[in-house]
Regions:
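Non-transmembrane alpha-helical segments in soluble domains
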Residues: 17, 99-100, 112
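Short alpha-helical functional segments enriched in proximate histidine and acidic residues
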Residues: 19-23, 98, 122-123
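Conserved catalytic core of Hanks-type protein kinase domains
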Residues: 47, 78, 101, 114-115
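N-terminal glycine-rich flavin-associated loop
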Residues: 86-105
Length: 143
């Protein structure tokens, strides 16, 4: 198995590191997690619009880049390296592949293009019957 990065993967890493060095960093973390969203929405728009991160591993028919999970894992690794609070992992690595694999055609058509362009974030929730406690809606309050 060849574990060397491709030229495209090196470019993804470089572009993401450059962007995070400019707009992220340890000083930006408290402000980002203090928002109602729990992340910096302006930086998320840059990651989505400029780099296409949420749609990196989504099929082109849904507005994604059509890359593999390896490129998405690389993006998640870089955002983790920068300690970036963002919806990338939950949205692009967890929810989007499940919607792509298990969603109805209507669900895929309605949700995946919005995930790919960054206008929709998503997360997973266990079915209520599997939860050990009574889940209730929670909206994060700004600090």
């Amino acid at each position: 198995m060849d574990t060397a990065l491709t030229t495209e993967q090196h470019e993804i890493r470089r572009a993401l590191r450059d962007l995070l060095a400019r707009y992220g960093g340890p000083g930006a973390i408290p402000a980002a997690v203090g928002t109602a969203e729990g992340y910096d929405p302006a930086l998320w728009r840059r990651l989505a619009g400029g780099l296409g991160l949420p749609g990196l591993a989504l099929a082109e028919e849904y507005g994604g880049a059509g890359c593999t999970a390896a490129e998405l894992a690389l993006a998640c690794e870089e955002t983790g390296r920068a300690l970036l609070p963002s919806p990338l992992l939950a949205t692009a690595a967890l929810a989007a592949p499940l919607i792509a694999a298990l969603g109805t055609p209507d669900q895929r058509a309605a949700l995946l293009p919005r995930i790919a362009d960054g206008t929709l974030t998503a997360a997973l929730r266990p079915p209520r019957r599997l939860a050990r406690h009574r889940p209730r809606p929670h909206r994060r309050q700004p600090r």
